[in-house]
Amino acid sequence: RDPLWSRGLGDVYKRQVLDTARLKYLIGEHLKVDNRSVHAFIIGEHGDSELAAWSNANVSGVRLDAFCEMRGHYFHEESEDKIYEEVKNSAYEIIQRKQATYYGIAMAVKRICECIIRNEQSILPVSSMMHGIYGMEDVVISMPAIVGKDGVEAVVPIELDEEEQEQLKKSATLLKELNTMIKTEHGVK
């Protein structure tokens, strides 16, 4: 069995779909709009180094900060931090109440499978090998990608501000270090 799967890391591919859905839901709730009109992504490694791509977020094509102001919300950083922390910690809260997060994970897997089976060409934040995007090489990390009948058909290099690019690179470095550690532990070259 693959060492990544035996360490519980094989489920990384679907988690950003779930966290992105949570992010869109919370932004929609905050702004009192249908979350299907919210376009935002959680990217990177699932866990402490994941990040919300705020600079790319929008509501029906209107930049998120401008839409927030249109709805009477002016404390962007404070609201973004609160929403992000809620997304990041939601799994822990669900586990405390239900002892597991399998329903949300099942819905994320269902969504990915629908995209593949129906050849939807939907853009989802799924993990795939990076080849030069933001300087990342030979690392599997979650980024928006077109998902269709062949799985990940193309990674979508969304615009990120400098701080987000640095956070993403740190996330990639963390994953590379973890991969090296696992390979070393299992004698894989």
Indicate residue ranges for each PLM-predicted region:
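Single conserved hydrophobic/aromatic residue that forms the stacking wall/gate
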Residues: R1-Y13
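Short hydrophobic/aromatic-enriched beta-strand-loop microsegments
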Residues: D11-K14, N35-S37
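C-terminal substrate-binding/catalytic lobe of Rossmann-fold NAD(P)-dependent dehydrogenases
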Residues: D19-K189
